[in-house]
Amino acid sequence: MSTLGMMLLILLLLVPLATFADDGPTMRGHRSAKLLAHTTRDSCPSGTNCPSKICCNGNCCSKSSCRCETNQATKERVCVC
């Protein structure tokens, strides 16, 4: 096999490693810290009675389809539905 062919083969074997480097579960089955922080950032603390399970700045959002955004004027996180 030529040198160029060998380089292409090595490159093709390394592409999946670079593509999925920091998303989802790690090799031992634990989630990456970046994904966990993004997932739990807008979650309500345990024991909070919030049907939507989404809290922004301590306030329960009315629907589970809402998301938290930062209000530019007050710099507080508010529910946007």
Swiss-Prot record:
It comes from the Eukaryota. Its main location: secreted. Residues 1-21 form the signal peptide. One of its GO terms (molecular function) is toxin activity. Contains 5 disulfide bonds. Expressed by the venom duct. GO terms for cellular component: extracellular region. Keywords: Disulfide bond, Neurotoxin, Secreted, Signal, Toxin. It is found in: Secreted. Residues 22-31 form a propeptide. The cysteine framework is C-C-CC-CC-C-C-C-C. Probable neurotoxin. Belongs to the conotoxin N superfamily. This is Conotoxin Im016.
